[in-house]
Curated annotation (Swiss-Prot):
Keywords for the protein's UniProt record, in alphabetical order: Antimicrobial, Disulfide bond, Fungicide, Plant defense, Secreted, Signal
Superkingdom assignment: Eukaryota
SS bond partners: C32-C73, C36-C54, C42-C71, C46-C72
Places the protein is found: Secreted
Family: Belongs to the DEFL family.
Keyword Disulfide bond: yes
A GO BP annotation: killing of cells of another organism
GO cellular component: extracellular region
Cleavable signal peptide: 1-27
Protein name in the entry: Putative defensin-like protein 84
Length: 87
């Protein structure tokens, strides 16, 4: 009985670990920085990573709702398919 519980616990732990590790290994997570005014500006800033986009996030600042724009870069620098060809 205890071996069944231990093995199922290990399997569950391994599955959670794998689900957390996959996005980090693939490099598909986007890095976001504060202060985006437009998507073209963000694209230029993120050119080496395959482009980017402005993303608005709603959060609380000093007890009030605040909307802040972030520049989120696509992390496609290791992918030969998604990377733009620069001459």
């Amino acid at each position: 009985m205890t071996t069944k519980m231990v093995s199922s616990h290990r399997l569950l732990t391994l599955m959670v670990f794998a689900l957390l590790l996959i996005p980090m290994i693939s490099g598909q997570s986007s890095k976001c920085t504060k202060g985006c005014t437009s998507t073209p500006e963000c694209n230029i800033k993120c050119m080496k990573k395959g482009g980017g986009h402005c993303q608005a996030y709603i959060g609380r600042s000093h007890g009030r709702l605040a909307i802040e724009n972030y520049c989120c870069c696509n992390n496609y620098s290791n992918s030969p398919i998604s990377s733009p060809v620069m001459n």
